[in-house]
């Protein structure tokens, strides 16, 4: 009796996913950014807050800069691509005076 279906002896080789593969940060290059992001997520109780998205962007930028992930457009990652968009996001969460 064989453990392989069809009596095939060839080894099964897993294929990596197209997205979502995150190599470990063994050197701790992005630990600070990761901790700031996780603290923000904890503070807002897991909600997708705009200020946490900006911290996520910093973290992902660090990972891209240190070749821990492939470069990708911010729009593909659902994040603002320039300072104007980032300012618009923070204005959404910053209370205005006089209310």
Swiss-Prot record:
Disulfide bonds: 30-62, 40-52
BP GO terms, sorted: mitochondrial cytochrome c oxidase assembly
Keyword vocabulary terms for this entry: Cytoplasm, Disulfide bond, Mitochondrion
GO cellular component: mitochondrial intermembrane space
Motif window: Cx9C motif 1: 30-40
Domain of life: Eukaryota
Biased composition (Basic and acidic residues): 73-91
Motif interval(s): Cx9C motif 2: 52-62
InterPro entries with a match to the protein in the record: COX19
Region feature (Disordered): 1-28, 73-99
Protein name as it appears in the record: Cytochrome c oxidase assembly protein COX19
Lineage: Eukaryota, Fungi, Dikarya, Ascomycota, Saccharomycotina
